[in-house]
């Protein structure tokens, strides 16, 4: 069984790699964002508790998020293993996750960090642009519209770049994320769970490296 966390800064390719891993290994892809939305929509006790913080503009306490993760890891589709997305983000959350996985007997088997240089990430993230009409997302390098200047989805001709995709904002966002990411990598390295792959490569090569790590165990 594979119980996995992928670590990496925004733009490192975690989303693409997650999809490829789920397709091959049939793992449950557990996203904390999706969990919050689902729990709040279904008005579960933990969902309502989380909503009370979000409605006030407060951060949801780690213990509440951990309850949500524990509920989700107890569901049937997790029997083949899981890949966690968006949790843990801090060492405190990592310790809570250890308690949960030990209690459920679903201990982590792998933590894989996708490493990409800051300048590459800035290039990737600041290359994003969107259709003004329908919000479809494109990338100057990897996902251009099929017809230049025309949105594939709605046929619109006006595009814009979000404020938080501008290079100086992206750089700041990456620095904030790295401050959170570095202690997590150290935490899992000490536990002997951490492996690192080179995220500068093409997505299929990144996946091949991840696949080699997962197949080995």
From Swiss-Prot:
Give the matching Pfam families: ADK, ADK_lid
Which region ranges are annotated with the description NMP? Answer: 31-60
| Entry's Gene Ontology molecular function annotations | adenylate kinase activity; ATP binding; zinc ion binding
Keyword Translocase in the entry? The reply is no
Extract the ranges annotated as region (LID): 127-165
| Taxonomy, superkingdom | Bacteria
Its domain description in UniProt is: Consists of three domains, a large central CORE domain and two small peripheral domains, NMPbind and LID, which undergo movements during catalysis. The LID domain closes over the site of phosphoryl transfer upon ATP binding. Assembling and dissambling the active center during each catalytic cycle provides an effective means to prevent ATP hydrolysis. Some bacteria have evolved a zinc-coordinating structure that stabilizes the LID domain.
Q: What does this protein do?
A: Catalyzes the reversible transfer of the terminal phosphate group between ATP and AMP. Plays an important role in cellular energy homeostasis and in adenine nucleotide metabolism.
This protein is called: Adenylate kinase
Species whose genome carries this gene:
Lactobacillus delbrueckii subsp. bulgaricus (strain ATCC BAA-365 / Lb-18)
Chain's gene name: adk
């Amino acid at each position: 069984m594979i119980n996995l966390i992928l670590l990496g800064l925004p733009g490192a390719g975690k989303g693409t790699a997650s999809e490829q891993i789920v397709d091959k290994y049939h793992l449950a892809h557990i996203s904390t964002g999706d969990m919050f939305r689902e729990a709040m929509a279904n008005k579960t006790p933990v969902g309502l508790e989380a909503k009370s913080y979000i409605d006030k503009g407060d951060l949801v306490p780690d213990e509440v998020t951990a309850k949500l993760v524990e509920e989700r890891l107890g569901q049937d589709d997790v029997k083949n293993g899981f890949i966690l997305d968006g949790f843990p983000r801090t060492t405190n959350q990592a310790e809570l996750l250890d308690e949960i996985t030990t209690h459920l007997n679903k201990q982590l088997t792998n933590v894989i960090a996708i490493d990409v240089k800051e300048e590459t990430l800035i290039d990737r993230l600041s290359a994003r642009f969107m259709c003004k009409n329908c919000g479809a997302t494109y990338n100057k390098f990897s996902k251009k519209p099929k017809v230049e200047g025309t949105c594939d989805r709605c046929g619109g001709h006006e595009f814009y770049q979000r404020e938080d995709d501008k290079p100086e904002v992206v750089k700041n966002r990456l620095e904030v994320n790295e401050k959170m990411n570095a202690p997590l990598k150290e935490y899992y390295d000490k536990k002997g769970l951490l492996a690192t792959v080179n995220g500068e490569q093409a997505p299929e090569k990144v996946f091949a490296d991840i696949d080699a790590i997962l197949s080995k165990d």
